[in-house]
Design a protein with these regions (language model features):
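Class I SAM-dependent methyltransferase SAM/SAH-binding core
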Residues: 32-34, 40-89
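A short SAM/SAH-binding and catalytic strip from SAM-dependent methyltransferases
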Residues: 99-112
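C-terminal helical/coil "lid" or tail adjacent to the Rossmann-like core of SAM-dependent
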Residues: 2-4, 183-239
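Conserved catalytic/acceptor-binding region of the Class I
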Residues: 130-196, 210-211
Length: 250
């Protein structure tokens, strides 16, 4: 499983939203910007940031628990200041960053409210906290209907891995509890509404196979993949997972 390709795919889902939120949050005038859970660098890499060539004065910081992910991130964002650390215990002084953001992170941290408290703590007064994308798998819809069984199994697997699968629908309330003034929130997309390319579909199946390893037989996976491929070619393949964003100010 090539996780950097997966993260790039996720980054593609939010590209327009990120450009909008960074603009509203004043990225062009920022001095220091932090990504919490930077992973392999799909977001923090210069190519993904708005008009990066015009704002070279902005210092980019990233933090992640995974040493392997950070090693990959250094290849894609060589100019960023990267640190290995925990989102629940950010190793930065109070009021350090103009913008602090995360992307598909809070569902994995175990205590998302504490993570938001930490993001708020390290953000300057009047600075901005952005949660770019948090899914709600409890409202997932799979089409054709025969695929719903596999969707449920994947959701169960995510729970077993420690994911908070319904966090998206609670995102605004978490910002409120953390004392972050909410400026805008909403559903950014229903994943699957646009037709997938074959490469994107194969990437989705790589994730499915990784999530379901040891819980579904190879024969079952092969049968479901064949069924799904037929649906894709008929234009009937669809996975809808409401995904939420929140933008707040300290």
């Amino acid at each position: 499983m090539n996780w950097h390709n997966r993260y790039l795919q996720q980054a593609g889902w939010t590209r327009e939203l990120r450009a909008y939120l960074f603009r509203k949050a004043g990225f062009s005038g920022a001095q220091r910007v932090l990504e919490v859970g930077c992973g392999t660098g799909a977001i923090i890499c210069e190519e993904s940031l708005p008009d990066r060539d015009l704002h070279t004065h902005v210092a980019l910081y990233g933090i992640d628990l995974s040493a392997a992910s950070l090693a990959e991130c250094r290849k894609h964002a060589p100019g960023a200041f990267l640190t290995r650390g925990d989102a629940l215990y950010l190793p930065y002084l109070d009021k350090t960053f103009d913008i602090t953001y995360c992307h598909f992170l809070l569902l994995w941290v175990g205590d998302p409210l504490r993570a938001l408290y930490e993001m708020k703590r390290v953000t300057k007064p009047q600075g901005h906290v952005l949660a770019m994308a948090e899914p709600d798998y409890t409202s997932r819809v799979d089409r054709p209907p025969e695929m719903s069984w596999l969707g449920k199994r994947q959701t169960e697997s995510l729970i077993e891995q420690g994911a908070d699968v319904g966090i998206g629908s609670r995102l605004a309330d978490l910002f409120y509890q953390a004392g972050i003034s909410l400026l805008e929130t909403g559903v950014i997309q229903n994943r699957g509404k646009d037709a997938l390319t074959l490469e994107e579909w194969e990437n989705e199946w790589s994730v499915l196979q990784a999530d379901l390893a040891g819980t579904v037989t190879r024969e079952e996976l092969h049968e479901m993949k064949h069924l799904d491929e037929q649906a894709l070619r008929r234009g009937e393949h669809e996975i809808i997972i409401p995904t939420y964003f929140a933008w707040g100010q300290v």
